[in-house]
Curated annotation (Swiss-Prot):
The keyword rRNA-binding applies. It comes from the Bacteria. Coiled coil: none annotated. This is Large ribosomal subunit protein uL22. This protein binds specifically to 23S rRNA; its binding is stimulated by other ribosomal proteins, e.g. L4, L17, and L20. It is important during the early stages of 50S assembly. It makes multiple contacts with different domains of the 23S rRNA in the assembled 50S subunit and ribosome. The gene is rplV. Part of the 50S ribosomal subunit. Keywords: Ribonucleoprotein, Ribosomal protein, RNA-binding, rRNA-binding. Belongs to the universal ribosomal protein uL22 family. The keyword Ribosomal protein applies. GO terms for molecular function: rRNA binding; structural constituent of ribosome. InterPro entries: Ribosomal_uL22 (IPR001063), Ribosomal_uL22_bac/chlpt-type (IPR005727), Ribosomal_uL22_bac/org-type (IPR047867), Ribosomal_uL22_sf (IPR036394). HAMAP family: Ribosomal_uL22_B (MF_01331_B). One of its GO terms (biological process) is translation.
Length: 126
């Protein structure tokens, strides 16, 4: 028995990409997400290409995926795409222990985060 087709959550002129496990804190990832919000996709790719932040390359891959989804799945024109939304969420926190003096140990938390990028096609009027 086949799965029933779900209704589309986004409007017709939008495409989305979601990356679930990025090994950085949401606070650091949000700095990169803020830098591309509202930009043309070509300009956003340039921003991410020359960013000094380590996580920017992973965000760049996600943006390429959103652009490919728009082009291949939704037949949108990639020259008129804009990053409509780029938002960040918390994910799991890996807990590790670090040895300290006198036989003690402290907990080290290694956070993961997730990012959702939505690209929108601008009409001719815009």
């Amino acid at each position: 028995m086949a799965k029933q087709k779900q209704e589309r959550r986004l409007p017709a002129a939008e495409a989305m990409c979601k990356v679930r496990t990025l090994r950085t804190s949401p606070r650091k990832l949000n700095l990169v997400a803020q830098s591309i919000r509202g930009l043309n996709v070509q300009r956003a790719l340039n921003e991410l290409e020359f960013s000094h932040k380590r996580i920017a390359q992973d965000v760049r891959k996600a943006l390429y995926s959103a652009i490919s989804n728009a082009e291949n799945n939704h037949n949108l024109d990639i020259d008129s795409l804009v990053v409509a939304e780029a938002y960040v969420g918390k994910n799991l926190i890996m807990k590790r222990f670090s040895p300290r003096a006198r036989g003690r140990a402290t907990r080290v938390e290694k956070p993961f985060s997730e990012i959702t990028i939505v690209v929108r096609e601008l009409g001719e009027a815009a």
